[in-house]
Amino acid sequence: MVNWQVIGQLVSTGLIGLLGPAVIILLALKKGNL
């Protein structure tokens, strides 16, 4: 049996970990401040 709850938590945590820095970088690029 696959534990979808654990997989969902891992995926959501991974997405947040990847999207967090990406959003910060995009905001920095839009402001022109790196």
Swiss-Prot record:
It comes from the Eukaryota. InterPro entries: PSII_Ycf12_core-subunit (IPR010284). The keyword Membrane applies. It is found in: Plastid, Chloroplast thylakoid membrane. The keyword Transcription regulation does not apply. The chain crosses the membrane at residues 6-26. Keywords: Chloroplast, Membrane, Photosynthesis, Photosystem II, Plastid, Thylakoid, Transmembrane, Transmembrane helix. One of its GO terms (cellular component) is chloroplast thylakoid membrane. It holds the Pfam family PSII_Ycf12. It is a single-pass membrane protein. GO terms for biological process: photosynthesis. NCBIfam families: PRK13686.1. PSII is composed of 1 copy each of membrane proteins PsbA, PsbB, PsbC, PsbD, PsbE, PsbF, PsbH, PsbI, PsbJ, PsbK, PsbL, PsbM, PsbT, PsbX, PsbY, PsbZ, Psb30/Ycf12, peripheral proteins of the oxygen-evolving complex and a large number of cofactors. It forms dimeric complexes. Belongs to the Psb30/Ycf12 family. A core subunit of photosystem II (PSII), probably helps stabilize the reaction center. This is Photosystem II reaction center protein Psb30. It comes from Skeletonema costatum. The gene is psb30.
